[in-house]
Amino acid sequence: MNLMLYHYYDSLFIAFFIIQSIVFVTWICFLIYSIKLIKNVPKLSSSKKSRKNSCSYMVSIILPARNEEKYIRKCLDSLVKQEYSNYEIVVINDCSSDNTSHIIKEYVNKTNCKIISIDTKPRPPAWTGKNWACYQGYLHSHGDLFLFTDADTTHSPSTLSLAVNYLLSENLDSLTAIPKILSNDFLTRITLPILWTFSLARYSALKANDPKTKMGYFFGSFFIIKRNVYEMVGTHKSVKEEIVEDGELGRKVKENGFSLKVIHGENLISAIWARDSSSLWHGLRRLLIPLYKKEIVKTTILVALTFILLLFPFIVLPFSTLTVINGKLGISDLTFLLFTIMSIILLILSSVLQLKYTLFENPLYSLAFPLASSFLFIAFVSSIISSGKKNTIEWSDRKY
């Protein structure tokens, strides 16, 4: 019996050692790649040489809004103060039940800036709400360029002029800026660094910026695109059923051979991705459920990797500690413990890096990594379990 237990313990140790070694190497790669992204992804700033006559291009800012009374004033305040001289703001009230419509009308009446206000009719069955609103905005626009943004996003006065100048100077068809993501609650602050790091595996800005790849995406809070390009990829009508429409539209731009660039805009643009813990939960489901329905095997592997990379080191820490205390396996047990501890340190360092340089939050939030990892894994598993049901995604007071 003792011999059988020893062989079982030995086999378990070898399996755990191999998995932990892979986790250790993976987090080294994540950390190195995160540093590379921070350093090498371009930044939207005034350092780029200004292009003459850039203001000759009319820009239509398309702003869909549904029940945004808490945020839309700040957004509109920032948009009407843009230094760029040739633009209009097309605001679409997407069947709001709060004071959003009233606030929009206030700005139409009190500002000198050209604001076009639209009240959408109820969306057709095949459309998601935001796509329908954006499409209605396009139909009422007059611009050569479109800037799509969200009602909970704010922009520095120079944002539009810098973005247009960058687009034209680089001879791009489209441009999207990474905003400063604002967090309103503790759970969002501890979860976003991990989510941001994990997103590197699928949504690498360096890969999106490589014209040789077909991978592309937009940040819904800020992307600018030429009118003819938007029309040639099919407008929002081509992604009318998509829940994560900004990612799909960006992918279509690259797949159709048009240029796209992802740049840092945190110094100029602020956005709220999750307004509280409830919207964080629904936001994660909004990301994963559509992905699971399209790529079942890949998404299942992703969830399994979430467990292995985030939770496995904490789970095996007691086991690796016991191997050192028992001292039955020689130097390998010490190596196992070292890999486990170093993996946890790398997890925390990756979180610190995102908190400090991407999310601009207190790095001490990284100490809550185990709680955040557990929350993410539960949200992902819940999404897979619910994916076969109807009305499982709740977003902007609608169910899909």
Sequence positions of predicted segments:
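Cell-envelope/extracellular polymer assembly enzymes that use nucleotide-activated donors
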Residues: 57-60, 88
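Acidic donor-binding segment of Leloir-type glycosyltransferases
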Residues: 76-123
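Acidic donor-binding/catalytic loop of UDP-sugar-dependent glycosyltransferases
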Residues: 99, 151-166
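Short, well-formed alpha-helical segments that are part of the catalytic scaffolds
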Residues: 40-46, 68-81
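Membrane-embedded multi-pass helical conduit in multi-pass membrane proteins
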Residues: 301-390
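N-terminal membrane-anchoring/stem segments of glycan-assembly enzymes
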Residues: 1-52, 205, 376
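Long helical/loop segments within the catalytic core of UDP-sugar-dependent glycosyltransferases
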Residues: 34, 117-139, 166-232, 237, ...
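Catalytic donor/gating beta->alpha subdomain of glycosyltransferases that bind UDP-sugars
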Residues: 167-170, 174-200, 228-231, 236-299, ...
